[in-house]
From Swiss-Prot:
Residue spans of biased composition, Gly residues class: 756-765
Keyword annotations of the record: Calcium, Collagen, Extracellular matrix, Hydroxylation, Phosphoprotein, Repeat, Secreted
Entry PTM: Prolines at the third position of the tripeptide repeating unit (G-X-Y) are hydroxylated in some or all of the chains.
Self-association and partners: Trimers of one alpha 2(I) and two alpha 1(I) chains.
Keyword Repeat: yes
Matching InterPro entries: Collagen (IPR008160), Collagen_superfamily (IPR050149)
Similarity annotation: Belongs to the fibrillar collagen family.
The gene coding this protein: COL1A1
Record's protein name: Collagen alpha-1(I) chain
Natural source organism: Orycteropus afer (Aardvark)
Subcellular location per the Swiss-Prot or TrEMBL entry: Secreted; Secreted, Extracellular space; Secreted, Extracellular space, Extracellular matrix
GO cellular component, one term: extracellular matrix
Regions of compositional bias (Low complexity) in chain numbering: 20-39, 101-117, 141-153, 201-251, 354-380, 389-408, 422-444, 516-543, 602-614, 627-654, 662-677, 686-696, 737-752, 811-826, 923-956
Record region (Disordered): 1-987
Length: 987
């Protein structure tokens, strides 16, 4: 029977308990290695070495001892790893900073230890979205699982394959935003995991009355990161924690298998944005995962509204790209987060043909969703259009290709670069896995305006919906090729060629509702009237308590669709909610391998010459120098005076001549031999204290910035409010309608019944999403729309709500006579999407006009570009210099500094005190005397030689015989002088 009117709104249920935290997403690629820490101070010079002793002349002095090496400069203090904040949404890739000048390499800091992975939390209701994290170097996006609560980010594991999307939970009320913490250190981005095959779309349950929005679930506390556990189901995304400073990147863990997606928790209300955290240094980039095979495309969802513009991150210091890490295992999910976002809508089936709207009959069943067509590649984004009213959240499509890295920011000091990791081929972005720790954010680009939605292609008359095929399992993700220009969208079912859309006439006043006649065959479709002016958006109705979800009515036969009424007024776009708190960044990964060595800057000026070492100790005496030449023989001494004759006695014979007198004193000491070769200088005394370091030369040209790390997957901006769908072009002339049965006889018009809730409309044609397509969340139960105002004139078709899995169609009303359409029942509500991401709450939509006949979906428009990267916001303050990276391996010994200029020659050391002359050389042997030449004339007496040393006494000759005892009396001597007078005699 026809579905009854919705019951009153129920009382909101108690806040849902936070769902379990989802597993931590696999780590993104490792960020580039952080810049090296500043060089440690130079150690004090060692004490000067002792000079070597002076050698004796000729003997080289002993080299002085070398002074002990000066102590190594203190190690730079490793920066502390920032507290990991909760992970925020993935930001855009920061612009690579220009390469900074190379700083002197500091000692290697200790590598930060990787934080443990947080334990998986339960999936909670969606928390307040954090402020968009500053983008790290994006890791490749994995397939998106249901968002788990973001745990404390551990080192991100690699993205695992995405599980199938879960069903959306109820949308929770908006929670208060927590303060944004400082950004945590960025973990290395893991390699991209292969996306798992999407699960088949679930069958749509019967549409019930939408429950009221529930109270926001309590926000789960962030737990301490646990050790990496097995992956659990991803929970809803928790509130982002404060962003901590980026720590050094932790090592990349192995990627675990992705868990099955959990059910999506209720979306929490948007919180106020927290302050942006300090950006940490990027972690090393991981290698990209293989591109998975292209999954079957889901239908394109309706574009969400553009997300609000993130704050630009500060430029990170670009580190060299780290080596590609291995795929880490996923860390356990963190503590339960706040309520997760509403789940993504399941894949939509092929839209059923729009029937001609008769008076609403009882709703008929919807056709089953057909298998999804192949995924079109995301096309290039169209130019941004003005933001439209916020539509219901569409199905999230696949994320678009990674944005290119932005312009390089000013580089920080050049660290010890690691070798660049290989850039993996960009994978096709799978669904985003549970987010890894964010890389340091680059400045968030401004959100580009959303391009106007392309005008929908003419919509042909959709064929009747086929029974839904099972969703194909997506193939494995192939290795991503470059994202080419978007390929054509996969073929859709054949559509008739849309005719031109006729001008829609103004809606006539609703006549009284006739009783439903027997359903006629579809009549020819009349021209659409001109679109009515959009009604203003009514104030949102008071949110009632959620009623119980009514059982789905049994689908009645589907009535013909009436002509599309004019479009209802667009709702005003909901405000974007405040940003959630950015989640903690995982602990720093290991320092990336040192990047390429930057060019050495020019050598600084030579330091001043060290102080002159003290004179060395005197060397030991060298061996005696060669004897000086013997002096010339002293002149013969004058013959001694002849002795007085002895007392007469026979004169003893003269003894034999004494041996030759001693050689004259040595001639003057020969000149001291030229000093022997100078002893080799002792090793230089310890260098004096280093002169002040020369100014660091102007930085060498910065190395070219390494190639930008692979662009991260385009961060998913929160999908902004959907661009207003371009006005649907006038509907093409309807394709030939199916044959119109003859209309049933009109029943007498009854008084218009209250419109039964409209059966779930056939699926709307899929509008291409201009944003990146995430996987569609299953639309959360729709909040009740505000009380339905009187239907505005039916506007052109509002943007289609997200295609949920087709609800079971209510039984189609029988087609009434195709008369003036009865007042259109309010369209069955598409579930209003749970607030997606930071979407503000959707204001109550003006009641959608009855949907116009769906044009055939135009080809999927090219995916909107991720909004153009907004201009780079002013750079945020540079994050604190990341902790000094682990000390890189000692770089190759720099070229030996130029030899300092030779110090001035020290004053010649005092000549060592001349050693005492060596003992005189032994006199040369006297050559044999030559035969005496004839005596030359007696030369003038030579100058007296220095008196020789007394010769050795000659051996006394034999004593001559005693002379006679009595000599002759000598002659009488002269009389002596008179003696003194004697003393007087006695009297």
């Amino acid at each position: 029977g026809p579905m009854g009117p919705s019951g009153p709104r129920g009382i909101p249920g108690p806040p849902g308990a936070p769902g379990p935290q989802g597993f931590q997403g696999p780590p993104g690629e490792p960020g580039e290695p952080g810049a090296s820490g500043p060089m440690g101070p130079r150690g004090p010079p060692g004490p000067p070495g002792k000079n070597g002793d002076d050698g004796e002349a000729g003997k080289p002095g002993r080299p002085g001892e070398r002074g002990p090496p000066g102590p190594q400069g203190a190690r730079g203090i490793p920066g502390t790893a920032g507290i990991p904040g909760m992970k925020g949404h993935r930001g855009f890739s920061g612009i690579d900073g220009a390469k900074g000048d190379a700083g002197p390499a500091g000692p290697k800091g200790e590598p930060g230890s990787p934080g443990e992975n947080g334990a998986p939390g339960q999936m909670g209701p969606r928390g307040i979205p954090g402020e968009r994290g500053r983008p790290g170097p994006p890791g490749p996006a994995g397939a998106r699982g249901n968002d788990g609560a973001t745990g404390a980010a551990g080192p991100p594991g690699p993205t695992g394959p995405a599980g199938p999307p879960g069903f959306p939970g109820a949308v929770g009320a908006k929670g208060e935003a927590g303060p944004q913490g400082p950004r945590g250190s960025e973990g290395p981005q893991g390699v991209r995991g292969e996306p798992g095959p999407p699960g088949p779309a679930g069958a749509a349950g019967p549409a019930g009355n939408p429950g009221a929005d529930g109270q926001p679930g309590a926000k789960g506390a962030n737990g301490a990161p646990g050790i990496a556990g097995a992956p659990g189901f991803p929970g809803a995304r928790g509130p982002s924690g404060p962003q901590g400073p980026s720590g050094a990147p932790g090592p990349k863990g192995n990627s675990g298998e992705p868990g099955a997606p959990g059910n999506k928790g209720d979306a929490g209300a948007k919180g106020e944005p927290g302050p942006a955290g300090i950006q940490g240094p990027p972690g090393p980039a991981g290698e990209e995962g293989k591109r998975g095979a292209r999954g079957e495309p889901g239908p394109t969802g309706i574009p969400g509204p553009p997300g609000e513009r993130g704050f630009p991150g500060s430029d990170g210091v670009a580190g060299p790209k780290g080596p590609v890490g291995e795929r880490g295992s996923p860390g356990p999910a963190g503590p339960k987060g706040s309520p997760g976002e509403a789940g993504r809508p399941g894949e939509a089936g092929i839209p059923g043909a729009k029937g001609i709207t008769g008076s609403p009959g009882s709703p008929g069943p919807d056709g089953k969703t057909g298998p999804p067509g192949p995924a079109g590649q995301d096309g290039r984004p169209g130019p941004p259009g003005p933001p439209g009213a916020r539509g219901q959240a569409g199905v999230m499509g696949f994320p678009g290709p990674k944005g290119a890295a932005g312009e390089p920011g000013k580089a920080g000091e050049r660290g010890v670069p690691g070798p660049p990791g290989a850039v993996g081929a960009p994978g096709k972005d799978g669904e985003a896995g549970a987010p890894g720790a964010t890389g340091p954010a680059g400045p968030a680009g401004e959100r580009g305006e959303q391009g106007p939605a392309g005008s929908p292609g003419f919509q042909g008359i959709p064929g009747p919906a086929g029974p839904p095929g099972e969703s194909g399992k997506p193939g494995e993700q192939g290795i991503p090729g470059d994202i080419g220009a978007p390929g054509p969208s996969g073929a859709r079912g054949e559509r008739g060629f849309p005719g031109e859309r006729g001008v829609q006439g103004p809606p006539g006043p609703a006549g009284p509702r006739g009783s439903n006649g027997a359903p006629g065959n579809d009549g020819a479709k009349g021209d659409a009237g001109a679109p009515g002016a959009p009604g203003s958006q009514g104030a949102p109705g008071i949110q009632g308590m959620p009623g119980e979800r009514g059982a789905a009515g049994i689908p009645g036969p589907k009535g013909d669709r009436g002509d599309a009424g004019p479009k209802g007024a667009d709702g005003s776009p909901g405000k974007d909610g405040p940003r959630g708190i950015t989640g903690p960044i995982g602990p720093p990964g290991p320092a990336g391998a040192p990047g390429d060595k930057g060019e050495s800057g020019p050598n600084g000026p030579a330091g001043p010459t060290g102080a002159r070492g003290a004179p060395g100790d005197r060397g030991e005496p060298g061996p005696p120098g060669p004897a000086g030449f013997a002096g010339p023989p002293g002149a013969d001494g004058q013959p001694g005076a002849k002795g007085e004759p002895g007392d007469a006695g026979a004169k003893g014979d003269a003894g034999p001549p004494g041996p030759a007198g001693p050689t004259g004193a040595p001639g003057p000491i020969g000149n001291v031999g030229a000093p022997g070769p100078k002893g080799s200088p002792g090793p230089p005394g310890a260098t004096g204290f280093p002169g002040a370091a020369g100014r660091v030369g102007p930085p060498g040209p910065s190395g070219n910035a390494g190639p930008p790390g692979p662009p991260g997957p385009a961060g998913k901006g929160e999908t902004g409010p959907a661009g207003r769908p371009g006005e649907i072009g006038p509907p093409g002339p309807p394709g030939p309608s199916g044959e119109k049965g003859s209309p049933g006889a009109d029943g007498p018009a009854g008084a218009p019944g209250t419109p039964g809730p409209q059966g779930i409309g056939g699926q709307r044609g899929v509008v291409g999403i201009p944003g990146q397509r995430g996987f569609p969340g299953i639309p959360g139960p729709s909040g009740e729309p505000g009380k339905q105002g009187p239907s505005g004139p039916n506007g052109e078709r509002g943007p289609p709500g997200p295609m949920g899995p087709p609800g079971i169609a209510g039984p189609p009303g029988e087609s009434g006579r195709e008369g003036s359409p009865g007042a259109e029942g309010s369209p069955g509500r598409d579930g209003s999407p749970g607030p997606k991401g930071d979407r503000g709450e959707t204001g109550p939509a003006g009641p959608p006009g009855a949907p116009g006949a769906p044009g055939a979906p135009g080809p999927v428009g090219p995916a909107g570009k991720s909004g153009d990267r907004g201009e780079t916001g002013p750079a945020g303050p540079a994050g604190p210099i990341g902790p000094v990276g682990a000390r890189g391996p000692t770089g190759p010994q720099g070229p030996r500094g130029d030899k300092g200029e030779t110090g001035e020659q020290g004053d010649r050391g005092f000549s060592g005190i001349q050693g005492p002359p060596g003992p005189p050389g032994s006199p040369g042997e006297q050559g044999p005397s030559g035969a005496s030449g004839p005596a030359g004339p007696r030369g003038p007496p030579g100058s007296a030689g220095a008196p020789g040393k007394d010769g050795i006494n000659g051996i006394p000759g034999p004593i001559g015989p005693p002379g006679p005892r009595t000599g002759d009396a000598g002659p009488v001597g002269p009389p002596g002088p008179p003696g003194p007078p004697g003393p007087p005699g006695p009297p």
